[in-house]
């Protein structure tokens, strides 16, 4: 049984309003998948962008594999995402017409050891929206604390 890896983009839910979620496969080299299985990746500042009809994740950081030597990959290269044609067309339409953004939420390996990326169609939050999120979270925490006392 393979150990599953789960790398999160923790700021995504705070900075964006998530509209829709998708799970995409990734085109990776051998040293990239080995680094991901070791948990040496970061998707905190990454985003997705269309180049033609294909979707790429940009600015994701996958550390070089320690034993890769001359065949190692570039840590910040663009990586192609694999989705159904129908899903790609829908995402492209939403990004072009509605001005939405696609960001990665989670990088993980499934039970077969394949690397997958959970992406989300999002709308950026304004500063006052972020303040509301903080207030709501604090109010919920206070209510839970009061309920626990009784």
Curated annotation (Swiss-Prot):
Keywords: Cytoplasm, RNA-binding. The keyword Lyase does not apply. One of its GO terms (cellular component) is cytosol. GO terms for biological process: trans-translation. One of its GO terms (molecular function) is RNA binding. Its main location: cytoplasm. InterPro entries: SmpB, SsrA-bd_prot, SsrA-bd_prot_CS. It is found in: Cytoplasm. Belongs to the SmpB family. Required for rescue of stalled ribosomes mediated by trans-translation. Binds to transfer-messenger RNA (tmRNA), required for stable association of tmRNA with ribosomes. tmRNA and SmpB together mimic tRNA shape, replacing the anticodon stem-loop with SmpB. tmRNA is encoded by the ssrA gene; the 2 termini fold to resemble tRNA(Ala) and it encodes a 'tag peptide', a short internal open reading frame. During trans-translation Ala-aminoacylated tmRNA acts like a tRNA, entering the A-site of stalled ribosomes, displacing the stalled mRNA. This is SsrA-binding protein. The lineage of its organism: Bacteria, Pseudomonadati, Bacteroidota, Flavobacteriia, Flavobacteriales.
